[in-house]
Amino acid sequence: MVPLCQVEVLYFAKSAEITGVRSETISVPQEIKALQLWKEIETRHPGLADVRNQIIFAVRQEYVELGDQLLVLQPGDEIAVIPPISGG
């Protein structure tokens, strides 16, 4: 069994509006695919499904595609959910 670790999820702009928080700590498997990590977050905040195809997902300040990429997380890692920023 893969051990769990606690990571901090940071929400920006529209994702913060949807979740109602700017950050939270969650417990997830230390080894997890990027898409599965997103699904864990989406389960907590179903409204994020509306922006899933628009967000930028970053782990330890590195962009990650929501796919089968295996992530090896460490306790305290930061996961950022960044929707597109509009403006002019």
UniProtKB/Swiss-Prot annotation:
Role played: Acts as a sulfur carrier required for molybdopterin biosynthesis. Component of the molybdopterin synthase complex that catalyzes the conversion of precursor Z into molybdopterin by mediating the incorporation of 2 sulfur atoms into precursor Z to generate a dithiolene group. In the complex, serves as sulfur donor by being thiocarboxylated (-COSH) at its C-terminus by MOCS3. After interaction with MOCS2B, the sulfur is then transferred to precursor Z to form molybdopterin.
Family listed: Belongs to the MoaD family. MOCS2A subfamily.
Domain of life assignment: Eukaryota
Name of the featured protein: Molybdopterin synthase sulfur carrier subunit
Modified residues (1-thioglycine): G88
Entries under HAMAP family matching the protein: MOCS2A (MF_03051)
Pathway the protein contributes to: Cofactor biosynthesis; molybdopterin biosynthesis
Subcellular compartments: Cytoplasm, Cytosol
Record's comment on post-translational modification: C-terminal thiocarboxylation occurs in 2 steps, it is first acyl-adenylated (-COAMP) via the hesA/moeB/thiF part of MOCS3, then thiocarboxylated (-COSH) via the rhodanese domain of MOCS3.
GO terms, biological process: Mo-molybdopterin cofactor biosynthetic process
Tissue: Widely expressed. Highest levels are found in heart and skeletal muscle. Lower levels are present in brain, kidney and pancreas. Very low levels are found in lung and peripheral blood leukocytes.
Keywords in alphabetical order: Cytoplasm, Disease variant, Molybdenum cofactor biosynthesis, Nucleotide-binding, Phosphoprotein
Record-linked Gene3D superfamilies: 3.10.20.30
Glycyl adenylate: residues bearing it: G88
Main location: cytoplasm
SUPFAM superfamilies to which the protein is assigned, alphabetical: MoaD/ThiS
Note: This protein is produced by a bicistronic gene which also produces the large subunit (MOCS2B) from an overlapping reading frame. Expression of these 2 proteins are related since a mutation that removes the start codon of the small subunit (MOCS2A) also impairs expression of the large subunit (MOCS2B).
GO molecular function per UniProt: molybdopterin synthase activity; nucleotide binding
GO CC annotation, single: cytosol
PANTHER family listed in its UniProt record: MOLYBDOPTERIN SYNTHASE SULFUR CARRIER SUBUNIT
Disease implicated: Molybdenum cofactor deficiency B: An autosomal recessive metabolic disorder characterized by neonatal onset of intractable seizures, opisthotonus, and facial dysmorphism associated with hypouricemia and elevated urinary sulfite levels. Affected individuals show severe neurologic damage and often die in early childhood.
Keyword check for Nucleotide-binding: yes
Subunit structure: Heterotetramer; composed of 2 small (MOCS2A) and 2 large (MOCS2B) subunits.
